[in-house]
């Protein structure tokens, strides 16, 4: 589990900042420049309000829709998830990389155009 070191208040709640850093390479299919960033701090954010704009701990603005904070379970019922927001990877905010903790297994996911695309992965 991430060690919570401090937090930042946002309109959607507290963002807990971890001292851990992340190095991540993102292959972009839309011919946008590849993204590689070191020493990216990430935090814990529990999304509760739809269509809010909040300023993240790294100064980026992110558009959030309430529906995207849920995943469907085996019975196709929505299940609330808690997101570990990592970074916004483009100025337009089209790509948001984050981690989702579910049943002690961390999944790396991408948020793009209002859809969640799931990929296997682990917290660094």
Model regions and ranges:
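Ribonuclease/tRNase effector modules and their secretory precursors
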Residues: 1-124
């Amino acid at each position: 589990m991430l060690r919570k070191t401090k937090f930042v208040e946002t309109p959607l709640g507290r963002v807990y900042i971890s001292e851990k850093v992340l190095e991540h390479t993102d292959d972009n299919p839309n011919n946008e420049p590849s993204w590689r960033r070191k020493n990216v701090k990430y935090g814990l954010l529990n999304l509760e309000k739809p269509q809010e704009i909040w300023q993240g701990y790294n100064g980026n603005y992110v558009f959030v829709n309430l529906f995207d904070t849920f995943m469907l379970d085996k019975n196709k019922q929505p299940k609330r998830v808690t997101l570990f927001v990592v970074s916004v990877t483009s100025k337009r905010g089209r790509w948001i990389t984050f981690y989702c903790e579910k049943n002690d297994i961390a999944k790396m996911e991408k948020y793009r155009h209002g859809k969640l695309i799931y990929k296997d992965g682990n917290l660094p």
